[in-house]
Structure formats: C-alpha cells, structure tokens
Regions:
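ABC transporter nucleotide-binding domains
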Residues: 2-6, 11-189, 194-214
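Generic beta-strand hydrophobic packing signal
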Residues: 7-9, 258, 294
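Short phosphate-engaging motifs
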Residues: 18, 196, 241, 276, ...
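Non-catalytic surface loops within mature trypsin-like serine protease
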Residues: 28, 126, 236-238, 272, ...
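Short, surface-exposed acidic/glycine-rich loop or hinge patches that mediate macromolecular interfaces
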Residues: 65-68, 72, 212, 239, ...
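Hydrophobic aliphatic residues
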Residues: 78, 177, 225, 308-309
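ABC transporter nucleotide-binding domain
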Residues: 174-267, 271
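C-terminal coupling/interaction segments
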Residues: 270-313
Length: 313
C-alpha cells in the first residue's frame, strides 16, 4: 500500500517558520488535495517530500523510507511535478520524455514503451512527434504530467498542476488526474482552488501558516465544520419536475432539503456520513430521473475552508 508521511516536519528560514511540526500520514490509492492559501506551506511540504529542500527538523517518509537519508530508495516509486519545468520548444514529447526516462534510469529497451504509455495516459499520443513549441499551455502541462508518470509510479506528487491554464486546459488536466485515480496510485496534489479539490479529490488536508488544520474525507470535513450536515450536487440528463424534487427526493431518509439549482441540477442537504451518501445515491438512481453526476458541493467546502482559515488569522 503506497504511503507518504510527515513526522514533526518543520522548515524555518531564520525567524520565519514556513512549516511547523507537520504530522500527516496518507495511505492507500486515492487523491488527496493539499489545500491552503498562497504562502501557507504547501510547496515547502512537497519540496521536502522530494528532497529539493531539507527540513529544519522532522522526517518526510515515503513508503516508510526517509527521503533525506535514503533518497534513491524513497523516490524510486514516486513521480513529481513541482514548479512546472519548461520543455525546450524544439523538442517533441517523444524526445523530451526519452531523455527523462534515461535520467530516471529506465533501461533502454523499455524507454520507448514507457514514453508511449505515459503520453497515452495524458491523451497526447497523437502529438508524440510534434514540436512542443507549437503546443498550448494545457498541452505542455499534459506533457509535464506525462514526465511524472514515465516510471509508472505508485505515488504522484503534483504542485498546483492547473495554475496558469485557461478553463479548457484546467478541465483537461483535472480529467487526467481523475483517470489516474483508477490506476492504483496515491496522488497528493496541492491547490488553492476549492472547486478543483472538491471535484477531483477524495480527501483534503487544509494547511495555513505552516500548520495542518484538518485532514479527512471531504464529506467528513464539511460535516464536522458546517453543523453536521452534508451537501451534494446532482446533475441530470433532462429537466426534472418540481413534484419529483419535492415529494420523491425531499422525502428520502436523512434528506433535510432538496432544491433545484436550475432545470438539470439539484442541491440536496442531508445528515450523515459516507454510508448515508452512498445510500442516497442508490435511492436517487432508482427514481430513474437521468442522473449523470453526483458530487459534494464545492460551496460547502468553501464555507468550511473560509471558516478554518479565518480562525487562524
């Protein structure tokens, strides 16, 4: 089971503390969002997990191995994208990734296969022999993510992977990250975009002023800090009748209220945890109203986030 763990991880620059006694253990194949405002310590943490900077004290462990004393062993199963590198515009994805594969120590007889597989994962196989200089920012970012996947890692560390992208590029990268979750990987992704974390991640760790505030599943975090209730948004294939919302959905067990956001989107407030959320989804599917997506509402995470961040000021 892949794991990353911070044990009393601290980084000081003179009198300034960038990270303070961070204790965080993440295990299993899932996507965890590392959420916090700019300057909160997110990038500092990721850089210590990749040995780009040394901690003042504490340990950064990957699969139980100390990154700073056994770097090669610890990072052997890790792919990283920290501070997005610029790929030479004259290179093709194939050329750039082949060089990275060589640097990573991938045997020469395996490089071609790994390059093709990594580009396929980010849906860039059609551009394998095109010059990077002609790519959009989103396409370049997908190639950079492919570079993190070149060794087929069990753990992927991403530092704000959608920063600087237009809405289309952001959506493309988020969809790629979602697809990576289904391939038995642990993804630890920093972000300051609440809707992104809500859409992509299974769990969230919130940090501010170098200190961890909370780490749990999204439903548990929103329930714990928003009065014990959870909110889900449901997208439908076709418009739903008001009577169905009022009678069939609002009357389901543990549902506090159900209302239409618009003709094809619903907001449902319910009490309970993941087990209730699972049952609620099954109950709604049985109504045969054309459900096409079901997710925690980002507005609830925003409310919790602002409440927690304000409390640390």
């Amino acid at each position: 089971m892949p794991s990353i763990e911070a044990v009393n991880l601290t980084k000081q620059y003179g009198v300034f503390t960038a990270l303070s006694d961070l204790n965080l253990k993440i295990e299993g194949t899932k996507c965890v969002g590392f959420l916090g405002p700019n300057g909160s310590g997110k990038t500092t943490t990721l850089k210590m997990f990749t040995d780009l900077i040394k901690p003042t004290k504490g340990q950064a462990l990957i699969n139980g191995v100390n990154v700073h004393t056994q770097k090669k062993k610890a990072l052997n199963s890790v792919g990283t994208l920290i501070e997005t590198p610029e790929i030479y515009p004259s290179l093709t994805p194939k050329e750039a990734l082949t060089m990275i594969a060589e640097i990573r120590g991938i045997p020469s007889d395996e490089r071609k296969k790994r390059v093709e597989e990594a580009l396929d994962e980010v849906h860039m196989e059609k551009w394998i022999n095109k010059r990077v200089g002609k790519f959009s920012k989103g396409m370049k970012q997908r190639v950079c993510i492919a570079s993190a996947l070149i060794s087929d890692p069990a753990i992927v560390l991403l530092d704000e992977p959608t920063t600087g992208l237009d809405p289309r590029g952001m959506n493309e990268v988020r969809e790629i990250i979602k697809s990576l979750k289904g391939k038995n990987r642990l993804i630890f992704m920093s972000s300051h975009i609440l809707s992104e974390v809500s859409d992509v991640c299974d769990e969230v760790a919130i940090i501010d002023h170098g200190k961890l505030i909370v780490y749990d599943t999204l439903p548990k975090v929103t329930a714990k800090f928003s009065g014990g209730n959870n909110v889900v948004e449901v997208a439908l294939l076709r418009p739903v009748d008001n009577k169905v919302v009022a009678k069939s959905i609002a009357s389901l067990p543990d549902v506090i209220s159900a209302q239409k956001i618009d003709d094809k989107n619903l907001k449902i407030i319910f009490s309970g945890g993941l087990d209730v959320q699972e049952r609620l989804l099954n109950d709604i599917v049985k109504l045969k109203i054309g459900i096409i997506s079901y997710k925690a509402a980002s507005s609830e995470l925003e409310e919790v986030y602002l409440k927690l961040i304000t409390a640390t000021l």
